[in-house]
Amino acid sequence: MGHESPLYSLDLFGHEMIFDLSSMLMLTVTAAIVFLIAMLFTRNLSVRPHGKQNFIEWIFDFTRGIINSNMAWNKGGRFHFLAVTLLLFIFVANMLGLPFAIINGHTLWWKSPTADPTVTLTLSTLMVLLTHFYGVKMRGTGNYLKSFAQPVWFMVPFKIIEEFSSTLTLGLRLYGNIFAGEVLLGLLATLGTAGAAGMLGAAIPTLIWQGFSIFVGSIQAYIFVMLSMVYMSHKVSDDH
């Protein structure tokens, strides 16, 4: 493939910070698309939903089901908008790199932002930190800290390790699936440039793989939201 990400380095108090401009661009595009979806699909709401309102209500019902399957609604209802936003954001992010890629020289500008491990690990870290925040807020600091020593005190180091492993698996699972899909699409696109025979040979596999990638991207968005709500329920529910 030989494609590189456009990087920008900044010296901050003697420490070099490196920014991936393509990931920043694609995250901005993703956020803008999700914002437009929210704006367009929630205009002129009616008691009897029709058209685009059916879609957005289905998203809300779907995420409500995810939350209800993990915790009581009186605790989980406050996370409803979080789940909806997370599902839409990750789904859109997973889809952006499928139709095409924008490459300037050897620099890749247009891709799925979730094909970058920094992005997915940042998302998973934010979600795990959010579970700790709500665990303390809803259960109290003392009760929350005690939960790490249950059922026996020597479980504490194992539960700390579990927090790190949950963060890694949540982020790397999403990254691995999306990155692998884009790599194969890139290889098929390269094959398509090898004359008429290569184009014909790559056309059908590319269409099939793009369809499969849409399915995988949708499933991965669902899994990320589901696991986030599972982790949240473990932190805010007294019976966990």
Swiss-Prot record:
An annotated Gene Ontology molecular function: proton-transporting ATP synthase activity, rotational mechanism
Membrane topology type: Multi-pass membrane protein
GO biological process: proton motive force-driven plasma membrane ATP synthesis
Record field: transmembrane: 21-41, 83-103, 116-136, 184-204, 207-227
GO cellular component: plasma membrane; proton-transporting ATP synthase complex
Keywords assigned by UniProt, alphabetized: ATP synthesis, Cell membrane, CF(0), Hydrogen ion transport, Ion transport, Membrane, Transmembrane, Transmembrane helix, Transport
InterPro entries: ATP_syn_F0_a_bact/chloroplast (IPR045082), ATP_synth_F0_asu (IPR000568), ATP_synth_F0_asu_AS (IPR023011), F0_ATP_A_sf (IPR035908)
Subcellular location: Cell membrane
CDD domains cross-referenced by the UniProt entry: ATP-synt_Fo_a_6 (cd00310)
Annotated function: Key component of the proton channel; it plays a direct role in the translocation of protons across the membrane.
Homology family: Belongs to the ATPase A chain family.
Assembly behavior: F-type ATPases have 2 components, CF(1) - the catalytic core - and CF(0) - the membrane proton channel. CF(1) has five subunits: alpha(3), beta(3), gamma(1), delta(1), epsilon(1). CF(0) has three main subunits: a(1), b(2) and c(9-12). The alpha and beta chains form an alternating ring which encloses part of the gamma chain. CF(1) is attached to CF(0) by a central stalk formed by the gamma and epsilon chains, while a peripheral stalk is formed by the delta and b chains.
Name of the protein in question: ATP synthase subunit a
Organism per entry: Macrococcus caseolyticus (strain JCSC5402)
